[in-house]
Amino acid sequence: LIVGTALAVGFMFDSADGQVSRVTGASSKTGEWVDHVADAFRSPAIHFCTAAAVMIYRPESWWLAVVALVYGWVTSGQFMSQILAEQFVRAAGRKQTRGGNLRSFVLLPTDPGVLCWSFVLWGFGAPFMVLYTFLAAVAVAHSSMSLRRRYRDLRALDAAAKQAAKEAAKQGESRA
């Protein structure tokens, strides 16, 4: 209960600091960078600590440590993919597409806050294992779909940039 609450409170502050800086006009590239770096360390750290705790306190459930390691690996890669793709899309002058309420609801199991609250069940053994494994499976499925979609989107940006370069070269030749 204490771990779940502490993680949730930490996540709440992590979410709030960016909102407060935007509302007050105090946001900066440095602040955004620090926030992303902290997130990049926090995300896999939760799972690696879970793997270590499983091996220390529940070694008979070693398979859950493997789930935790895979979960950490996937969330780390997903985070990097998301950050880079957003930067590339923004740099290309394209608008970011966000899903609606249904998408937010469907992706709720991938929300770090849900993960944090799942640790409230740690002391109950099996319910935690089932929920944590479910959250990991959803993260793997979401990451697979998201990575494929992002790759297609970025390939389309590359194709559009190549086409624009060809057209610019043709216009340059016709002027010469």
Task: Cite the ranges covered by each PLM segment.
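A feature for the membrane-embedded catalytic helix bundles of lipid/isoprenoid biosynthetic enzymes
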Residues: 36-166, 170-176
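Membrane-interface alpha-helices at helix entry/exit sites of multi-pass transporters
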Residues: 29-37
